[in-house]
Amino acid sequence: MTDNWRIWNKAKDYGDLLYKRAIGDLDEMESSKALCRVLSSFYEKRMKVLDVGCGAGHYLRSIRLGIDEDIDYTGVDATEYYVNLARTAFGDAARFLRGDIYNLPFEDNSFDIVICNNLILHLPPPPIKPVSELVRTSSKYIIVRTVFAERNYIIKEVRSSYEEKQGLPIRDGNLIDSKGEPLVYNYFNMYTEKYFRDIVADINEKIDVKIVPDDSWSSFDNTALAGKTATKVISGKQVSGNLLLDWRFLVLSQK
């Protein structure tokens, strides 16, 4: 498998957008607010929290505003540019590291709570290894926000905009190579509740699994900020391009 799906090193504009949310120049993401609602149900003072796929630190801003201003927080992201933005936003008030979800740079049970928002769907299938790493580094709770579906779908969203912004001549007719592989793409995978329950049981059958719908958000439209395929609300449903998004939280508790 190629690394053509790792688009974020080229997506500096997206990192800059997250940075503006982290420092308060833009509103909090609805997913950040939803995370806080789930997290607040079991968070206690002095718990250590790891944020996997932390971006530019925008989730930390929401957690500080909604839960604990002095939270013991560590953020990790595979994209160095995003990590540097997060360090700029928060200085020494939080720890941000570069690291990969497939091999997190922490010992077993290093954190009370591990959170992972909006990342699993963008990883190559199957998500077993990433989820097992989240479980490994947590001593108590894991929160994963991702898209669910009635069937399992492996989706490749073919991209060209990053190359176009760098002045490279990418024509739509040349987006897919002779072997059927997109030149640049990101995954947008959707899995069933049963699939997640089964892989968690394979990792550790003693883990308690709870599915929490993420449907308590205000109406919004991100297309002005992030383009015509950005997430928006239509008739009470979140939509991205042609995809209907059933966001839920996978909440795992270690027994």
Label the model's feature ranges:
Residues M1-Y43, I143-D172:
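Conserved class I S-adenosyl-L-methionine
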Residues G53-G55:
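Class I SAM-dependent methyltransferase "Motif I" SAM/SAH-binding loop
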Residues G57-Y102:
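Class I SAM-dependent methyltransferase SAM/SAH-binding core
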Residues I115:
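A conserved beta-strand element that flanks and buttresses the S-adenosyl-L-methionine
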Residues L123-E133:
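A short, conserved alpha-helix within the catalytic core of class I
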Residues Y185-N204:
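Short alpha-helix
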Residues D198, D208-K255:
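A C-terminal cap/extension of S-adenosyl-L-methionine-dependent methyltransferases
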